[in-house]
Amino acid sequence: MDRIVEIEKADFEEEIETSLRPTSFDDYIGQSKIKENLKVFIAAAKKRAECLDHVLFYGPPGLGKTTLAHIIANEMGVSIKITAAPMIEKSGDLAAILTNLEENDVLFIDEIHRLSSAIEEVLYSAMEDFRLDIIIGSGPAAQTIKIDIPKFTLIGATTRAGMISAPLRDRFGMQFRLNFYTSDELAKIVQIAAVKLNKECEKNAALQIAKRSRGTPRIALRLLKRIRDFAEVNNENIINENRAKSSLDALGVNDLGFDEMDLKYLEILGSTKNRALGLSTISAALSEDEGTIEDVIEPYLLANGYIERTAKGRIITAKSCEILGIKYKMTQKGLFDEDQ
């Protein structure tokens, strides 16, 4: 099901997202602690004339992991090569990428948790010793060829840090979790992006967009672009609060950033009242795969207290019951009483 608040990036958005992407830490809104630490580490690496240590970014999709990788490369004054783990199928694929890097370049691997164990084995020596150990042949006749490669910085990005093997994770000298953005931060991002899209967006309008963006810049920018379309058709050069509200309502995004899929998810949990639901059950009810539910739908709901995840499954909270108009009553066991 296509969703206007879908966090995953579609191919057609790549070009316009690049044009809206900040190119320096000074232009990057949010994630203040991460920015300040990275500034120090980059300055130290440049002072020593070394490549930056390897970096792992993790957290929900759409929060700026790729953007930060680009900024790191810009601040270091080096090139960045971008790939995704599913595209690295054989050790030869990785070898081709690494041998084509220049000294101190940045290699960005998205979805790094999806690397196979065989590829990880090759990556270990590359990360630690800047050397490739390639095994040729098999059995007693197998030989290991050692190839020196340029020193480089690996930046890995993942939405599932728990799925990264411990040996790979431990080789990242810097590990940062990206958090959801505040409404004020998102409003600033929206207003800056609106100017780049040749529109003026009033502050109250930007806040309306921010409130419905699930703490995620990618969603905020997608909503802004759709609202711009409504304004364009109505010959409006300025996006005001009324335009933002009416457009968002037309798009089916409510004041909490929920769309039909979120509400259906909560209604499924609310209908059980006195028992938790497992992921497979929710997946079947929503006709969505489990990975999409875990990576896209649930993070925002969990972070904001709309659901809880227990050993027995997912349960609805009082906060969500109030939204749905469902009676919430806890038993001594900590579950919900059924209406009598």
Swiss-Prot record:
InterPro entries, per this entry? AAA+_ATPase, AAA_lid_4, DNA_helicase_Holl-junc_RuvB, P-loop_NTPase, RuvB-like_N, RuvB_C, WH-like_DNA-bd_sf, WH_DNA-bd_sf
**One Pfam family this chain carries?**
RuvB_C
This enzyme's EC code(s): 3.6.4.-
Task: Detail the disulphide connectivity of this chain as listed in its UniProt entry.
Answer: none
One GO process term, biological-process aspect: DNA recombination
Binding of Mg(2+) occurs at T66
Q: Which SMART domains match?
A: AAA (SM00382)
* Residues reported in the UniProt entry to bind DNA: R309, R314
Q: Gene3D superfamilies, per this entry?
A: 1.10.8.60, P-loop containing nucleotide triphosphate hydrolases, Winged helix-like DNA-binding domain superfamily/Winged helix DNA-binding domain
Region Head domain (RuvB-H): list its residue ranges. Answer: 255-340
Q: Name one GO molecular function term.
A: ATP binding
Record keywords: ATP-binding, Cytoplasm, DNA damage, DNA recombination, DNA repair, DNA-binding, Hydrolase, Nucleotide-binding
- Which top-rank group of organisms is this from? Bacteria
Which top-level enzyme class is recorded in the Swiss-Prot or TrEMBL entry? hydrolase
Query: What is the recorded function of this protein according to its Swiss-Prot or TrEMBL entry?
Result: The RuvA-RuvB-RuvC complex processes Holliday junction (HJ) DNA during genetic recombination and DNA repair, while the RuvA-RuvB complex plays an important role in the rescue of blocked DNA replication forks via replication fork reversal (RFR). RuvA specifically binds to HJ cruciform DNA, conferring on it an open structure. The RuvB hexamer acts as an ATP-dependent pump, pulling dsDNA into and through the RuvAB complex. RuvB forms 2 homohexamers on either side of HJ DNA bound by 1 or 2 RuvA tetramers; 4 subunits per hexamer contact DNA at a time.
Q: Which family does it belong to?
A: Belongs to the RuvB family.
Q: What is known of its domains?
A: Has 3 domains, the large (RuvB-L) and small ATPase (RuvB-S) domains and the C-terminal head (RuvB-H) domain. The head domain binds DNA, while the ATPase domains jointly bind ATP, ADP or are empty depending on the state of the subunit in the translocation cycle. During a single DNA translocation step the structure of each domain remains the same, but their relative positions change.
The protein's name: Holliday junction branch migration complex subunit RuvB
Q: Which organism is it from?
A: Campylobacter hominis (strain ATCC BAA-381 / DSM 21671 / CCUG 45161 / LMG 19568 / NCTC 13146 / CH001A)
| Taxonomic path | Bacteria, Pseudomonadati, Campylobacterota, Epsilonproteobacteria, Campylobacterales
